[in-house]
């Protein structure tokens, strides 16, 4: 009986899990291997001795050196970090206060307003593209980081608000009522009682907003035209793909370096991220 249970566990759990892990992680493995391959193995593998498509025996840092010496990759990294952090902070501040108001304050049409905010999040970004481009042009913000810092919250705030609404609803109202009885104002109760309890939800919303801002491509491609103002997704694809010529090594190196900040954010806050999403669903 025990042997049968072990067999079923291997067949129905471990083998499918191993398959999905390989399926999900193989692109990252291929990206890492390609970024360290010399050009000879990338473009003329038939001339390379002991060529292995899944491994390289002569790793090189030339592609990373090319990124930092021959392109503006350092500027792209700085621009992406600045835009992602600024838009995330703006979206979190607005989302936390809006989520608290819609979930904890009793006023007419609060539920309908919350539903409307979530529907706004579902609106495709392409529908907002033309009016946002007109606003950016009228205020002369084109080709500046502000063009993205002020437009990204249009799709980040609705999600942050919806997530925080669910999390605030899961926080017992008795905590806030006890603080009010002890003489705290609503502002003090929210700031010192509710928000500290909702930290996992805030971190979840922040990680999600940061990831979307970091990886966003369409707005960054259109609103930023100068090479020194571009973000990593736009700079890597526009400068390292020239017609039908692909600089595969530098492309993969740029993708690898560009994915590190997001991977670090998830690895450090994954527990808070999962608990935050769980709390928002329960709410």
For every predicted segment, state its role.
Residues 2-283:
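A structural signal for multi-pass alpha-helical bundles of membrane permease subunits
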